[in-house]
Amino acid sequence: MRNVLYLLNYAGKAGTERYVETLVRYLNHREINAFFAYHEGGLLVERLEELGVPTRQIELRSRFDLRAARTLARLCEEWSIDLVHCQFLREHYIALLAKQYNKRIRVVYTNHFILPNNAVTRFTNRLLDKRQDQMIAVCTRGREQLIANGWKGDRIRVIFNGVDLEAWAGPRSESTLRQELGLPEDRFVMLCASRFADDKGHRYLIHSVKRLTELTSVPFTLVLAGDGPLLEETKQQVRDLGLEDKVVFLGFRKDIKNLYKGSDLYVNSSRHEALSFLIIEAMAAGLPVIATDIAGNPDIVNDEAGCGLLVEYDNPDSMAVAIKCFLEEPDFLSKCREGALRTVAEKFEVHKMVEDTAKVYELACAR
């Protein structure tokens, strides 16, 4: 059984942390023995420790931190690590540099952001590529971007994120969301759950809601769940546009299933996204989706899937018209609900993700 060290700079509560936790929950003590090292602690550390995973905090000051590379190499020797699985560029470079001090370890990197690198980083990627054992892109465009960023494509596998269908099943009547907010059962509820940061597109989403009020008389409520640096700014925007009766802020919530089950539609307004766990979870809970046409979203929402609509980023008119379709066409809403459940079962089921990732570990260790 392989000893796998998951390495993460910040062990918080976002999608990448969910990815790591999912792999650990399904692989630990079955296919691998899991270990975890991190720079800045957070909720993920607590969750992994509850699962009995050994954890260690190490300093990761920059992507070229040789001291961190030596520390990581020693930690891998102490724990007899076979493979280090990294999630972001900083810890990825450090893990590749650590191979200089510990020849045994192999490195797998999962790309969670679809962003072009600058010329210096592309050059560095090409230099380090010979040390790279395997890469995982969570969407089709992710693989294309990795190659454009200087990594060779022969060791890049596309593995979609996956969720447990049973975990998100259940009747809508289970939800207490509408009761909590004082909303009638026939109110159309849209949900967006994400961190309030610039790349999540809340400002554009709020402008879309303002435009929607001009297009329809059907009552609706937009529910926003999450926290982050732009939360207060977004609340002020809602007040400035006079949308206090249309938009509700919940803050950070752990009862995400309760929110899905109390909603009619999931909305993703991100500018950057690899392959959103939240979109897939919402679909597994039976929600159709509106998502921006960026990065991995077209792998989820497309004509074949029939689970929702793609819209242009930062185009409030496009978003408003898409929402109006679901508001005023109940048959279309029902059809997309069916498409959402079918698509998750066919393409985004957790066991496929986990099994394919375990195969990548074996490919890496065989090099």
Task: Name the predicted role of every residue range.
Residues 303-304, 308-316, 325-330:
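Conserved acidic donor-binding segment of nucleotide-sugar-dependent glycosyltransferases
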Residues 252, 271:
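Aromatic "clamp/platform" in nucleotide-sugar-dependent glycosyltransferases that forms part
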Residues 108-136, 149:
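A conserved, positively charged/aromatic
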Residues 86-92, 111:
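Short His-centered aromatic/hydrophobic patch
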Residues 14-25, 188-211, 222, 229-235, ...:
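A conserved mid-protein helix/loop that constitutes part of the nucleotide-sugar donor-binding site
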Residues 179, 318, 325, 332-347, ...:
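A short, well-ordered alpha-helix in the C-terminal region of glycosyltransferases
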Residues 37-38, 288-291, 301:
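Short hydrophobic beta-strand element within catalytic cores of glycosyltransferases
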Residues 63-67, 144-148, 153-155, 162-180:
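Acidic anion/phosphate-binding donor-loop and adjacent secondary structure
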